[in-house]
Amino acid sequence: MSSRRQFLISTSAAAVLPAAAAMLAVSSKAWASDAPISDAELQRQMLAKLNVELNDSTIASTEAPYLQDIFFSWDLPSIPVAQIGAIVAYSFGDRPAAASGANATSGTGQSQLPQPGPINEEIADAVHQLVQSKPVMVYAQWEVASVLTAKYQMSSANLQSIKPPTVASNGTISYPALDDVAAAIIALQGTAAALGTVAVVTHRDQAKRAIQTSRAHGMNAYAAQGVTLPVDYDAQASQPANRRRDLYLLNDMMNQFATLRASLIAQQYPNG
């Protein structure tokens, strides 16, 4: 967890809405310039605006670092390929199984497991590229692992498939969360330390949260330097939020806030 997350977050909607407004209200003069303002100047202006909106300088000082991290910090911690001890690949969406008669408009009402789809194929391509440079064990979520097996003939010698979605009798599909996948990977090895230094491969917009989740489970997780992560979106994805970047980013930031909120509540009130 980043040190900036070690404060108590306000959980009221009254705090969140002005905070979002503050993000959009950062100096019009600064936005008019081609050069982005510095992180320090951004935080100064956010603090000033939040203090006006909330009329509480203490709370503004607490909330601003969270907003700056979640809204404005998307860089990834990275390591050289030579330092990688294992690869962890998280999937990103999927496509409805054509054989089941389902399509993107039918949502999760399917009679069989979905198809990996083009984005997970791109993630698998990135994993394969990395394996060529550093042949280590790959722990890949099912959608990615299925492509690695079919397209690149990877086997149990260097690939472990993790957590497929489940299809209920009524056609409802349940997808594992990043937390579930990370926990399942560690269960295979017994400890996170046994994985060594981990390179996380997934969609670029999910990578920050995927690395944070991996670290929360004890993994020494990073992005791999020199590996280009997928940035495309699939308009035919089963999940509506995964079809467009604007929708996905809102979804991802919401999940970051939810994780932060749960963590801070657990820290402050461990007994409930």
Task: Label each residue range with its predicted role.
Residues 1, 22-36:
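C-terminal segment of N-terminal export signals and the immediately downstream linker at the start
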Residues 1-15:
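N-terminal secretory signal peptides and thylakoid transit peptides that target proteins
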Residues 7-8, 32, 264:
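Sequence-pattern detector for short linear motifs
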Residues 14, 24, 97, 255, ...:
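Residue-level detector of solvent-exposed, low-hydrophobicity positions
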Residues 18-19:
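Bacterial N-terminal signal peptides
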Residues 31-244:
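A structural signal for short, hydrophobic/glycine-enriched beta-strand patches
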Residues 232-272:
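C-terminal capping/extension of enzyme domains
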